[in-house]
Amino acid sequence: MSLETSWENTPASAGHKASMSDGYDFSALRILVVDDSFHMRELVRTFLEGFGIKEVTVSSDAEEAYDIVVGMDPDLIITDWNMAPVSGLEFVERIRKGANVPNRFVPIIMLTGYTEMKRVEEARDAGINSFLAKPISAASLYKRLVTSVQDKRQYVESTGGYFGPDRRSPKRRDFRGKERRDRE
């Protein structure tokens, strides 16, 4: 399922702030939830199923989740940061750089209690699309879902090894000068 085409004629596409009363049809989405906490996995699963999502797959560790991504090709991934032996950050980097991942462009929401700016930047630099701080609510998760699928940012690959959503500020997208990132 193409996330972009499934959202073209929704209120959020016209600049409307998403709320759970908007009545989005999430039923065809396939979402992978990765968290080592059983209670958090079940909470997120319950919220997602409450939003009408029929296919929610859960994993308790990033190694297993990577294998699931390769076989499932989810429409969206929600992952915790602090997991062992592979962290959520390493999981995101592996997806973005993965040779056998069916869709390196899959939207990824990082779900974590780590909210320091350094951590947010680190997650962004790993290639996440959105950041959601714990504790979560149904409303906050819903807004991140809508934001993630509505996000029109292009994906970029840098010579420094980054692959993921364009990290430049959306306020600067109308920049008309010479792009310093352009290759000669």
Segments predicted by a language model, with ranges:
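CheY-like receiver
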Residues: 22-24, 150-184
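Two-component/phosphorelay signaling modules centered on CheY-like receiver
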Residues: 38-57
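Alpha4 helix (beta4-alpha4-beta5 surface) of REC/receiver domains from two-component response regulators
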Residues: 45, 90, 104, 115-130, ...
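Helix N-cap/capping motif at the beta->alpha junctions
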Residues: 58-67, 88
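Active-site beta3 strand of CheY-like receiver
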Residues: 72-78
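Receiver (REC) domain active-site loop signature in two-component systems and cognate sites
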Residues: 83
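C-terminal output helix
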Residues: 136-145, 149, 153, 157-158
